[in-house]
Amino acid sequence: MINKIYGKVIEKKESSLVLMTAVFEFELLVSAFCLANFKLLDKVELFTYLYTKENELKLFGFLNSDERETFKSLIGVSGIGPRAALRVLSNIRYNEFKDAIDREDIELIAKIKGIGKKMAGKMFLHLQGKLLINNELESSLFRFKELEESIVSMGFDRKIVNSKLKEAFNLVEFSNLKDSEKEQFLFKEVLKRMSN
């Protein structure tokens, strides 16, 4: 199984990213949140899921393992295929989806185009208590809270700073750095992205 792909974004389509690796180009179907996270020529790391059915092979890409696990849980629900699962994750973030399931907020899920109340109820019955997320991104954000505060104190909007930090966390350059180098990289990368 292909667990992760490291590559450079060479094309962005309506619902997919094309990544150039050392040898191959891969097109990965991704959520709207994942798509919005990256720009052309960004070097990225995506978790993957290879969907196989009869003569159909599709490669899906995810920001982290939690988003991938949520996708896999969704396609385990009868009547939910990979496209519908991706539509869910394009309308609501994986952690918000888990919260909605835990809170029994069927109305929120039912509002997603193509889902409706009946399917939302089926999701709730199938998934309640089964969605576990590792909060990798959240724990990383907490670790660099002081950095976020220092950038906000420069006059930047907190929500935008938070969003740019999340983008930087998913860059290959960040994951390859020593811990001692990560804060300086994030500071420079976030400021660069804020000015674009």
Swiss-Prot record:
GO terms for molecular function: ATP binding; four-way junction DNA binding; four-way junction helicase activity. Residues 1-63 are annotated as: Domain I. SMART domains: HhH1. GO terms for biological process: DNA recombination; DNA repair. It is found in: Cytoplasm. Pfam families: HHH_5, RuvA_N. Residues 64-139 are annotated as: Domain II. InterPro entries: DNA_helicase_Holl-junc_RuvA_I, Hlx-hairpin-Hlx_DNA-bd_motif, NA-bd_OB-fold, RuvA, RuvA_2-like. Keywords: Cytoplasm, DNA damage, DNA recombination, DNA repair, DNA-binding. SUPFAM superfamilies: Nucleic acid-binding proteins (SSF50249), RuvA domain 2-like (SSF47781). This is Holliday junction branch migration complex subunit RuvA.
